[in-house]
Amino acid sequence: MSKLGVLLTICLLLFPLTALPMDGDEPADRPAERMQDNISSEQHPLFEERHGCCKGPEGCSSRECRPQHCCGRR
């Protein structure tokens, strides 16, 4: 039984319980901070408000902007 106690003591010294994240440290518990860190799509420089259109250097000719509804095409 003393071997188990020694092993437990060594494990707790090498990996203390304070190293584990607690429930309060989860980002899901802090939505206000999570929203400040997250860049929404409206603030992204390559996003145009028209349903996912790009306005980067390649414009609608890039592969990401090929939908028919993009950039005024119907």
From Swiss-Prot:
Pfam families given in the database record: Conotoxin (PF02950)
Proregion positions: 20-74
A GO molecular-function annotation: sodium channel regulator activity
Tissue specificity remark: Expressed by the venom duct.
Signal peptide residue numbers: 1-19
Function: Mu-conotoxins block voltage-gated sodium channels (Nav). In vitro, this synthetic peptide displays a low blocking effect in mouse extensor digitorum longus muscles (IC(50)=616 nM).
GO CC terms: extracellular region
Residue numbers of 4-hydroxyproline PTMs: P57, P67
Species: Conus tulipa (Fish-hunting cone snail)
Annotated protein name in UniProt: Mu-conotoxin-like T3.1
Membership in a protein family: Belongs to the conotoxin M superfamily.
InterPro entries referenced in this protein's UniProt entry, alphabetically: Conotoxin
Residues with 4-carboxyglutamate modification: E58, E64
Written domain comment of the UniProt record: The cysteine framework is III (CC-C-C-CC).
Disulfide bonds: C53-C65, C54-C70, C60-C71
Subcellular location: Secreted
Residues found modified as Cysteine amide: C71
Keywords: Amidation, Disulfide bond, Gamma-carboxyglutamic acid, Hydroxylation, Ion channel impairing toxin, Neurotoxin, Secreted, Signal, Toxin, Voltage-gated sodium channel impairing toxin
